[in-house]
């Protein structure tokens, strides 16, 4: 036999992967997990050992039936005999129980693996997941629901037959009946996919696949123009006219080889998708304008690519423009850890002109070169696995999703699971609108036939049939619902010490935003000096300007804290941070941040006040009023402005002033508050430098009881 995975051999022998791994360790055969491979000698040795064990068990139990050469059937049947053994007291009840267990075995193997049954006939040990439905527990224990519920009431718990109980409660109930429960390892969706639906590939089945490329860079540095030049089309112009089929990805051919370009914004390919565990990008093209150099979004793109551990190719664009200085770009890139090959580094740089079409072929050849070095491979002769790039609800087609096939081949008619949705592929079209019957690895296709709209980053998996697809999706939906009810465990300063003590935090990632570059560097250096033997502090991104949506998504993907100095988060960033539970801290003085983090690391953080946002007003005009100074004619865009509130004046994302309201008027009347959608005049106490377009934020400081 050829090399075999641990889980495959375990299935053949009729034992659990965990049991087989323990046996391997007893034999001094080192394996990492259930996906590890075994050579022929080790596999044959195990088969012999387990065959001998089976013969001993069979002779001890004096079974009259002839031993079948396929020992795994005996091993599978034995747990069922115990599980379904008829009780003399109530034979009818067990007949029903037997039927239910039979029905259960017809469902996907997933249920047995995660939540239900794995029995040891000798030791009476049952194995369950982190929780179990009470009805399933009664079947396992071979007891009536009334009997088990009565036991739980005696333990002070009121539960119903369909209620989920945790492992500790289930173990307590089982012990009342002399049965021991073991907790199985909790599997995530990827484990389910690898172990139960689709086996891992053999090295000999893998073939080269086209690379998937994302183009990133600062605004106006020529990302879209470069893609236009690469695809030899004016995509922007055509999309405006509604001609081009936009599915979020496109393909080009060069030297009879294919390259796939993702059209999604570069940062999204690295943040929102990476936060969901999906890696879609193989190579990142970093576009830098030769006349402009490295800019804030360029640095952001570098940090995203580094965090995702993706190879970078630099495209120095606009070399045809006056003032283009390639050496300056290379110098600035080296300052941010990107060392070009010509300067002794390992990052490829290609000078290009998207408008003139200069060196476009050279750039594509470099992509193919990196692809050859990285050896991107997939197995086209297996069930497909892919990832969702975009998804929407179309009035005519229903749910439409753009999927990048990462492994295997997807066919029209395949039953699929996509996150917590499912369906059968009704139709597939490529980036030019052609209908396809099948899609191979690194092909982007638009599919229809899903039950609901999936999220970008969800994994698509082909399964055996519609029933398995539906059951798997429903199970994932239930799991997601349970997870939603729990508070997402993000790192925050308030509980940093506790997480350090429990060993949950080994590295604290920090994103620093400030009003000037000097502050960013000073803060990064000061914070990184705070590292100790329990936790190391690492600044994964630093930039100038307001805290943006992109910063929050990077923090969510990297489990980081955001610290801001003299800057504020945008409205969108604030909303997303609440949803993703990302901790944002803003300061006026650098040392306050250092003291806070230092105090949190030694368990001394005890904040007395919390800032509560009340509302925002946009300054539409500024008037000089005799005796009152400058009054800001404002429109309330969010919440409300209170006369007694503290305020800060924000200009272009930078905090210009913090203070109190001197006057608040509607027409000629003094008022205590003004709500959303109304205009008013706001006088800021002892401050007159108000300009049109400024944002006035009102807030109060609320005491926190700990």
Curated annotation (Swiss-Prot):
Pfam families: EF-G_D2 (PF22042), GTP_EFTU (PF00009), IF-2 (PF11987), IF2_N (PF04760). Residues 93-108 have a biased composition (Basic residues). GO terms for molecular function: GTP binding; GTPase activity; translation initiation factor activity. Residues 353-355 are annotated as: G5. Its main location: cytoplasm. Residues 208-375 form the tr-type G domain. Residues 242-246 are annotated as: G2. SUPFAM superfamilies: Initiation factor IF2/eIF5b, domain 3 (SSF52156), P-loop containing nucleoside triphosphate hydrolases (SSF52540), Translation proteins (SSF50447). PANTHER family: TR-TYPE G DOMAIN-CONTAINING PROTEIN, TRANSLATION INITIATION FACTOR IF-2-RELATED. This is Translation initiation factor IF-2. The gene is infB.
